[in-house]
Amino acid sequence: MQDIKTYLSTAPVLTTLWFGSLAGLLIEINRLFPDALSFPFFSS
């Protein structure tokens, strides 16, 4: 029972940290290397 409580308390924390770091990484990649969808807006 203690293992289940430990799993339920750590899985959301680890998932939040993982998705937060993944989102930050994707934001920084798109900031440094913007995709082609943003080119028409800045070319005018």
From Swiss-Prot:
It holds the Pfam family PSI_PsaJ. It is a single-pass membrane protein. It comes from the Eukaryota. InterPro entries: PSI_PsaJ, PSI_PsaJ_sf. GO terms for biological process: photosynthesis. Keywords: Chloroplast, Membrane, Photosynthesis, Photosystem I, Plastid, Thylakoid, Transmembrane, Transmembrane helix. It is found in: Plastid, Chloroplast thylakoid membrane. The chain crosses the membrane at residues 7-27. One of its GO terms (cellular component) is chloroplast thylakoid membrane. Belongs to the PsaJ family. HAMAP family: PSI_PsaJ. May help in the organization of the PsaE and PsaF subunits. This is Photosystem I reaction center subunit IX.
